[in-house]
Regions:
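A non-catalytic, amphipathic alpha-helix used as a structural packing/dimerization or gating element
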Residues: 9-16, 93, 97-104
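ATP-dependent small-molecule kinase phosphotransfer cores
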Residues: 1-47, 74
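Short, flexible helix/strand-to-coil boundary loops that buttress conserved ligand/catalytic motifs
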Residues: 2, 14, 22, 50, ...
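Short acidic active-site motifs
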Residues: 17-20, 41, 90, 97, ...
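Short amphipathic alpha-helical segments
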Residues: 41-44, 66-69, 121-122
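Short glycine-rich anion-binding loops that position phosphate/pyrophosphate groups of nucleotides
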Residues: 33-37, 60-62, 114
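NTP-dependent small-molecule kinase module
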Residues: 53, 82-83, 96-128
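A glycine- and Lys/Arg-enriched "phosphate-lid" helix/loop adjacent to the NTP-binding pocket
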Residues: 50-97
Length: 128
């Protein structure tokens, strides 16, 4: 979709489906990509719904680069980057630009140096 129609087309579709999901209230957990909260008024749209708990999983650029570099070929926005350092710089720049949107989340969890189990436990506490 990205390659054929570009990012804006993707973001419009993304917003359309976000709206569709919330037309039928039912319990669910949605993991959104890093750009989702930053386009249109997506973060405000999510936060206005009393049934939605937005959580910013705050991760350092170094940790994100380490995690994403192995899988970058499947991600259109970063597949062209040649080194982990280039990826780190790209992530740091985008985190800086996107941080005001991320900080609008109702809760923040710092993920660095935490196990998946401890993160799941922390999220479950927020949902309880």
């Amino acid at each position: 979709m990205f390659d054929d129609n570009g990012e804006l087309f993707f973001r419009k579709k993304e917003r359309f489906y976000l709206e569709q999901i919330f037309m039928k209230p039912h319990p669910l957990i949605i993991s959104l990509g890093g750009g989702t909260p930053c386009y249109f008024d997506n973060i405000d749209f999510l936060n206005l719904n009393d049934q939605v708990l937005t959580i910013f999983l705050k991760t350092s650029p170094k940790e994100l680069a380490k995690r994403l570099y192995k899988k970058k070929d499947n991600r259109p926005m970063i597949s062209h980057l040649k080194s982990e350092q280039q990826l780190h710089d790209y992530i740091a720049k985008h985190l800086y630009e996107r941080l005001p949107y991320y900080l609008k989340a109702k809760k923040t969890i710092i993920t660095d140096k935490k196990t998946i189990k401890s993160l799941v436990d922390e999220i479950n506490l927020l949902l309880a």
